[in-house]
Amino acid sequence: MAKLGKRTRAAREAFAGKSNLTIEEAVALVKANATTKFDETVEIAMNLGVDTRHADQMVRGVVGLPNGTGKTMRVAVFARGPKADEAKEAGADIVGAEDLMETIQGGTIDFDRCIATPDMMPVVGRLGKVLGPRNLMPNPKVGTVTMDVKAAVEAAKGGEVQFKAEKGGVVHAGVGKASFDEAKLVENVRAFVSAVAKAKPSGAKGAYMKKIVLSSTMGPGVTLDVDGAVSE
């Protein structure tokens, strides 16, 4: 515990007094202080001026990070026949129909992304209470209900990130690993911020992006200059 305490104190000292940084400055600081034995995820949290209780203020979308997430994504696909074969050939980890539904209902959710062909939605719909809270429910708005199964699986495996404003208007995601080069992390952060900016809903009032914080899995967070991050 003493070693952990020392590391934590050092990180806090490094972050003390620092705020409203550029993306480059924030990435450098977070990366330099991600010193645990495992490869920490660099995470972004954005506080948005929206009330997700209103349909016209929902923020949801998908973005392909230029340098991937560094995470191995496990993809499940609901499909039958040729589309099931297509999913397997594209690299899907789990492919099924009613059998997959029963597995999930039994409590086994061993995947990070769920894709379905449109004809499978009556089956998938029964899993709304299970997949919905985990943000795993296939949705045509983010390309996970589609006949182009191959493209959807490849996108998920290639670093595509889904985002959705949660209660309080917070959007968060992993944008890479601490082992990534700074330049690659900067590119990923820019891509994510840009995607959320473009997803501004019609019902949003006042300031849309209120706060952006960058951190690593075990490290403290640092705030970014919102105006600068959006304009980059």
UniProtKB/Swiss-Prot annotation:
Could you state a single Gene Ontology molecular function term? rRNA binding
Q: Which UniProt keywords apply?
A: Repressor, Ribonucleoprotein, Ribosomal protein, RNA-binding, rRNA-binding, Translation regulation, tRNA-binding
User: Which Gene Ontology CC terms are recorded?
Assistant: cytosolic large ribosomal subunit
The question of whether rRNA-binding is a record keyword is answered with yes
Please give the PROSITE patterns that the UniProt record associates with this protein: RIBOSOMAL_L1 (PS01199)
- Highest taxon listed in the record's lineage: Bacteria
Query: Which InterPro entries does the record associate with it?
Result: Ribosom_uL1_bac-type, Ribosomal_uL1, Ribosomal_uL1-like, Ribosomal_uL1/biogenesis, Ribosomal_uL1_3-a/b-sand, Ribosomal_uL1_CS
Gene Ontology biological process terms in this record:
regulation of translation; translation
Share what the entry says about its subunit structure, partners included.
Part of the 50S ribosomal subunit.
HAMAP family, per the entry: Ribosomal_uL1_B (MF_01318_B)
Q: Which NCBIfam families match?
A: rplA_bact
Instruction: Extract the PANTHER family matched here.
Output: 54S RIBOSOMAL PROTEIN L1, MITOCHONDRIAL (PTHR36427), LARGE RIBOSOMAL SUBUNIT PROTEIN UL1M (PTHR36427:SF3)
Function of the molecule: Binds directly to 23S rRNA. The L1 stalk is quite mobile in the ribosome, and is involved in E site tRNA release. Protein L1 is also a translational repressor protein, it controls the translation of the L11 operon by binding to its mRNA.
Q: Would you identify the family this protein belongs to, as annotated? A: Belongs to the universal ribosomal protein uL1 family.
The name this protein carries in UniProt is Large ribosomal subunit protein uL1
Species in which this protein is naturally found: Ruegeria sp. (strain TM1040)
